[in-house]
């Protein structure tokens, strides 16, 4: 291996001598430094620690909702997460499917246990999201290095979502009680510059409200040879249907110096935040028509649209955006049948009778858009994205369209031939469509909004 001698290094100055107008536009002037000098950004002293959200009201039980107050023990809230302990579930030998019965939690347990979450200031909703958003957001923003850990957090693990045979059968087991964790994707959780300044909001009661689904919409009782699913009842389980659960909301609070605390409490501040909007759910039947449109009566500056056609044949089978219902596979695993493909064939976007996006194949929305503008391409089938922003996950504006100024915006979705086949039903055992499959079109929008903090309270200056 050769090396550059001292005289050879001198020739490197030729490169520096080529500096001209192009370089003036690309690089800094005489007061700039190279990448080899670390620039230091002095910040105020602070520390952070976890805190339990207290002042709980309501009942943390399946099918109920509860709310907690944001702790005042800190000056800023950096993030929040829900910890919930699932109950132990044992399928009795005398269940309604008998020896062929199996029991499991639905896919993405914590996404489905939580029906909705709302952040409110004095009963004014600042941000709200539901199961569909949790499914979609995690698909587009989850780095691969964190995916396995995230699945462990939300319960997407074999001990909970793989079928467990009834007592007395081969492979019989109990679905264990388990502590699950759901990071709550609020606007203040992704960028420290958007931390929630509770120190500046002494006159606001800040609460997080969590609505939980009923237990019979979460546990799947399925026949292990036909794939038939039956709504679960109390007599199927040892001890009956679980009711109350252990649930707590935790937050990371930051503590700052007295000088910064005093300055922040008297400063008027505008924060650019994100919110989630949902169009009314539209039931679609490809046997009646293959193309459907839904009006998108959204408001504010929309940065991204996310849409899915959800298979809603069985209420207990959540997070299913394919044409058919999963069945019990070999070794008591979950098997996706051959027709477990995307129900969407193509989609177009129309503004006021003008085509904004032509009819694009599903691969554009599920592969191309996420490749360029999101952190991840979805690993699950059936998720579709159109991002006005150059970076979906960046909370800072990088592109949007003000839907409040559009009088007629609609999304036109064409369903696939496989969806038409499955909607007719009549498939064989374990085909996933022995019964007619039902679908719902779900459209979500992520929008920017302005929160103004002034005189100890928050508000929305632009409604």
UniProtKB/Swiss-Prot annotation:
GO annotation, cellular component aspect: viral capsid
InterPro entries: Capsid_N (IPR031654), MCP_C (IPR007542), MCP_C_sf (IPR038519), VP_dsDNA_II (IPR016112)
Keyword Manganese belongs to the record: no
Keywords: Capsid protein, Late protein, Virion
Record bears the keyword Amino-acid biosynthesis: no
MF (Gene Ontology): structural molecule activity
Primary subcellular site in the record, as a coarse category: virion
Pfam families per the UniProt record, alphabetical: Capsid_N, Capsid_NCLDV
Subcellular location: Virion
Coiled-coil stretches: none
Role, per record: Major capsid protein that self assembles to form a T=133 or T=147 icosahedral capsid.
Family assignment from sequence similarity: Belongs to the NCLDV major capsid protein family.
Subunit structure as annotated in this protein's UniProt entry: Homomultimer.
Protein name in the entry: Major capsid protein
């Amino acid at each position: 291996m050769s090396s550059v001698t001292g005289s050879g290094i001198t020739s490197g100055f030729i490169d520096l001598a080529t500096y001209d107008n192009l370089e003036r536009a690309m690089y800094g002037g005489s007061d700039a430094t190279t990448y080899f000098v670390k620039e230091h950004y002095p910040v105020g002293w602070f520390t952070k620690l976890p805190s339990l959200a207290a002042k709980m009201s309501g009942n943390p039980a399946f099918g109920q909702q509860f709310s907690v107050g944001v702790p005042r023990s800190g000056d800023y809230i950096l993030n929040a997460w829900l910890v919930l302990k699932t109950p132990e579930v044992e399928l009795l030998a005398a269940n309604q499917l008998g020896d062929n019965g199996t029991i499991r939690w639905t896919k993405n347990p914590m996404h489905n246990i939580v029906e909705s979450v709302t952040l409110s200031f004095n009963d004014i909703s600042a941000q709200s999201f539901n199961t569909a958003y949790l499914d979609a957001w995690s698909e587009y923003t989850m780095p691969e290095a964190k995916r396995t850990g995230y699945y462990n957090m939300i319960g997407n693990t074999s001990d909970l979502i793989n079928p467990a045979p009834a007592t007395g059968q081969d492979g019989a087991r109990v679905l264990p009680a388990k502590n699950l964790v759901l990071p709550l994707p609020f606007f203040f959780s992704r960028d420290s510059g958007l931390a929630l300044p509770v120190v500046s909001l002494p006159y606001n009661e800040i609460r997080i409200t969590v609505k939980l689904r009923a237990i019979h919409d979460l546990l799947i009782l399925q026949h292990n040879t036909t794939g038939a699913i039956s709504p679960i009842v109390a007599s199927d389980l040892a001890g009956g249907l679980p009711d109350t659960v252990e649930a707590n909301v935790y937050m990371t609070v930051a503590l700052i110096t007295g000088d910064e605390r005093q300055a922040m409490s008297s400063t008027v501040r505008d924060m650019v935040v994100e919110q989630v909007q949902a169009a009314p759910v539209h039931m679609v039947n490809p046997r009646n028509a293959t193309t459907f449109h839904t009006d998108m009566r959204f408001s504010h500056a929309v940065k991204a649209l996310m849409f899915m056609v959800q298979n809603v044949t069985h209420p207990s089978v959540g997070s299913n955006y394919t044409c058919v219902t999963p069945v019990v596979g070999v070794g008591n695993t979950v098997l996706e049948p051959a027709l477990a493909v995307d129900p969407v064939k193509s989609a177009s976007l129309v503004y006021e009778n003008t085509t904004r996006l032509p009819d694009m194949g599903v691969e554009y929305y599920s592969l191309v858009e996420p490749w360029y503008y999101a952190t991840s391409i979805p690993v699950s089938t059936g998720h579709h994205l159109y991002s006005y922003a150059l970076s979906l996950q960046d909370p800072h504006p990088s592109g949007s369209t003000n839907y409040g100024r559009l009088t007629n915006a609609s999304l036109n979705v064409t369903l696939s031939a496989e969806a038409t086949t499955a909607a007719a039903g009549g498939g064989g055992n374990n085909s996933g469509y022995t019964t007619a499959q039902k679908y719902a079109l779900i459209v979500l929008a992520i929008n920017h909004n302005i929160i103004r903090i002034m005189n100890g309270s928050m508000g929305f200056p632009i409604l």
